[in-house]
Amino acid sequence: MANHAAKPLALTLGEPAGIGPDITIAGWLRRRELNLPAFYLLGDEALIARRAKTLDKTLGKALGAEIRIASVSAHEAAAAFTEALPVVATGERATAEPGQPDASSAPAALASIRQAVADVRAGRAGAVVTNPIAKSVLYRAGFRHPGHTEFLAELAAKDGRVPQPVMMLWSPRLAVVPVTIHVSLRDALSQLTSELIVSTVRIVATELKSRFGIARPRIAVSGLNPHAGEDGSLGHEEQTIIAPALKTLRNDGIDARGPLPADTMFHEAARSSYDCAVCMYHDQALIPIKTVAFDDAVNVTLGLPFIRTSPDHGTAFDIAGTGKANPASLIAALELASRMAAAKT
């Protein structure tokens, strides 16, 4: 991939018992073949060494390559990357076995995220890339955030002000953003306001320009109700909430189109007419992208003072340690983060 970031990417450990270590190792093994940007893993070197030993019989043998691990500092990571997977210690041990999540390893997962943010804000890394976490495991250890996105926003706070995080799912074929994120459908309906739509779309438009190089972003905005409410016969939110938001956005000079019926927004011809689809709730946005780009979609958090991407899948405990985990989404996340960092203005 061209236009790599000048600095290595900080990759978090994710859930230690999940496939995060697996796809990290699998991605590193393909670094030369795919010309991947340099990255380093923040976590417990002993855990990664154990997983590497397990995977050497499958991944290493299949690719005809030796899995090598190097304990380094963030400053040494880029130089080490060619010959070994750089691992930067966080001071937290992780003892969980593949497929057997243990709340005692939660501090290691959280320390990895905190250190990645600290590294990118200190200029040691070009972007943050996060491996999948298991929120249910973190909750047992006292974690109180709905997800990665909200935790990262808190870590990005400055002078007590927490930025509004916007979750984008991106692929070469489709990019989507849900206005409401990790809440129940009932709560999503109560949270939906014109102000939230306006602030979300403004962030999307700004970052499509600055980090994706799109000079005049075309943003398609969905309705909430079936057939976008059919002029109020199937719901009023399009008229009372979404349309006023679109008027404000257009007055700002933003190309925001809608409200559009969600059931006809995502076929191939429709997708070619916009750069990003903004939807009203989580599943309205995620079902289409996981249908058209299940293996290579990337989770991108917009609205933060740093770049963050993540593979668009979970921990897959059932295949952890087997060598069966597909690293395609992580590879896409690394490549996109590097491209965004190189293009950042």
UniProtKB/Swiss-Prot annotation:
InterPro entries listed in its UniProt record: PdxA (IPR037510), PdxA_fam (IPR005255)
Binding of a divalent metal cation, residues: 182, 227, 282
Domain of life: Bacteria
Gene3D superfamilies reported for this sequence: Isopropylmalate Dehydrogenase
GO molecular function: 4-hydroxythreonine-4-phosphate dehydrogenase activity; cobalt ion binding; magnesium ion binding; NAD binding; zinc ion binding
Cofactors demanded by this protein: Zn(2+); Mg(2+); Co(2+)
Assigned protein family: Belongs to the PdxA family.
HAMAP family named among the record's database cross-references: PdxA (MF_00536)
Subunit structure of this chain's protein: Homodimer.
Protein's name according to its UniProt entry: 4-hydroxythreonine-4-phosphate dehydrogenase
Organism listed in the record: Bradyrhizobium diazoefficiens (strain JCM 10833 / BCRC 13528 / IAM 13628 / NBRC 14792 / USDA 110)
